[in-house]
């Protein structure tokens, strides 16, 4: 059963079921809006030089819902209250090519939609309590280090960001 949190402006879902890619556009559609931006992430075949067969996602769901709600609220503060935001993340076992995260943002203008979408996925990757156990073709598996440890995030933060401090 999916773990679903919905209000009139955003929908957050953590689910063991496959992600229907049309769900974000359906939720974010509004006749007042002229723009929709989305991001889809899926399991890639090679990571850090190793052949990947799949990923098992785990999460502390109550905290994850809280963090994702905060991220959506921050995006509204920065990019405007006239947004609709959809966030869905897979949990459990996934295979190469499976969609694992879907972000959608509807807005009056494209700049707000695109920037808010980027903000939501970046903050999700760095703040949401979601853990990845990567499975490899050789039968081995290993936990993927948290994204907040990545050098890319530290260097991006030094250049400044569009989000709240």
Swiss-Prot record:
Pfam families membership: MoaE
Top enzyme class, one word, equals transferase
Annotated metabolic or biological route of this protein:
Cofactor biosynthesis; molybdopterin biosynthesis
**Which biological process, per GO, is one annotated for this protein?**
Mo-molybdopterin cofactor biosynthetic process
Give the Enzyme Commission number: 2.8.1.12
- Write one Gene Ontology MF term: molybdopterin synthase activity
Q: Which CDD domains match?
A: MoaE (cd00756)
Do the record's keywords include Transferase? yes
Protein role: Converts molybdopterin precursor Z into molybdopterin. This requires the incorporation of two sulfur atoms into precursor Z to generate a dithiolene group. The sulfur is provided by MoaD.
How is this protein named in the record?
Molybdopterin synthase catalytic subunit
Source species, please?
Answer: Synechococcus elongatus (strain ATCC 33912 / PCC 7942 / FACHB-805) (Anacystis nidulans R2)
């Amino acid at each position: 059963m999916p773990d679903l949190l919905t209000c009139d402006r955003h929908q957050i879902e953590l689910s063991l079921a496959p992600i229907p890619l049309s769900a974000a556009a359906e939720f974010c559609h509004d006749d007042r809006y002229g723009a929709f931006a989305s991001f889809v992430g899926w399991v890639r075949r090679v990571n850090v030089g190793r052949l990947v067969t799949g990923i098992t996602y785990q999460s502390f769901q109550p905290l994850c819902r809280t963090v994702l709600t905060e991220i959506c609220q921050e995006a509204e503060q920065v990019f405007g209250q006239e947004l609709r935001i959809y966030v869905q993340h897979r949990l459990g076992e996934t295979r190469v090519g499976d969609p694992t995260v879907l972000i959608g943002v509807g807005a009056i203008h494209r700049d707000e939609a695109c920037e808010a979408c980027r903000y939501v996925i970046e903050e999700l990757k760095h703040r949401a309590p979601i853990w990845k156990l990567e499975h490899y073709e050789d039968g081995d598996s290993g936990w993927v280090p948290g994204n907040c440890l990545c050098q890319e995030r530290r260097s991006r933060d030094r250049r400044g960001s569009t989000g709240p401090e």
